[in-house]
Amino acid sequence: MGTLKAVANPRASRRAFFGVAALVFVASAALTVAGCVSMQTMSELPMPGGWSMSMTWAPMCGQKWPRVAATFVGMWMVMMVAMMLPSLAPVLWRYHEAMGEAGSMRAGRMTALAGVGYFSVWAVLGVIVFVLGVALMSLALRVPSMARAVPIAAACVVLLAGILQFSRWKSRYLACGRMLTATHSASKAWTGGMRLGVHCILCCAGLTAVLLVNGTMDLRAMACVTLAITAERLAPFPDRIVRVTGAIVVVKGLWMLLQAS
């Protein structure tokens, strides 16, 4: 009886863990879709060079910059939860199991702290992306020659992102992004999650750049990047997935370069 109970508890804990993860994923995905649909109803500003600037980077009538920034970072975080959780959940579960007390409340708290630490790093990245995006768009509005160069610059970014997939940088941080050291210290759980978040950001730098170039509110781009990130983390042969993704992104970059020129 004791053995059956020991087996049943981890199974019940596993179901509960992935059930909660699935609910969080569905909620964040639904909010992301709603946000994208809302943004798509807003007109874009035509720019020299044949592209259009999204209103994501500009305040609407009566809005103040702090509110614009808070809205962007909020949408960014909801989007990142939806995109990263499918590949993060197995890592967090292994961390939960490694605590040696899979059914305990303490293991759950440590796992939650690690997850919050992980996404806090993505929140900081969201702030950086917003500041850089506003600065670049403001410069493009003031300097027409720079606005005309944006399509070529975007194509080069995508091309470099594809090449990055074949680098040792990618292999190194892809391996680091699968590990989270178990600890019974709340502060170390938080910092461990943050460290994992940094590794994931560095690992996904190229794919994140592709997403930003194609539009942060583009559902198709989000879906493709999410599938690529999840596949390269969970597939039995991640190196093959990384190379295939890299080849696709390189072709995309060359096509964009051809169109821009």
Regions found by a protein language model. Give the residues of each.
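Residues within membrane-spanning alpha-helices of integral membrane proteins
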Residues: F18-F25, P151-V158, G162, M222, ...
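A mid-sequence, solvent-exposed acidic-amphipathic segment
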Residues: R168-G206
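Transmembrane alpha-helix/helix-exit interface in multi-pass inner-membrane proteins
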Residues: A123-S138, R142-V143, V150-G177
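A small-residue-rich subset of transmembrane alpha-helices
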Residues: S104-A135, C203-K252
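Small-residue-enriched transmembrane helix starts and helix-helix packing motifs
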Residues: G62-V81, A154-V158, A186-V198
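Juxtamembrane transmembrane-helix termini in multi-pass membrane transport proteins
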Residues: G2-N9, F72-F119
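Histidine-/acidic- and/or cysteine-rich, low-complexity loops and terminal segments associated
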Residues: M1-M77, E101, M137-M146, R168-H184, ...
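Generic transmembrane alpha-helix signature in multi-pass membrane proteins
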Residues: V78, P90, R94, G192-V198, ...
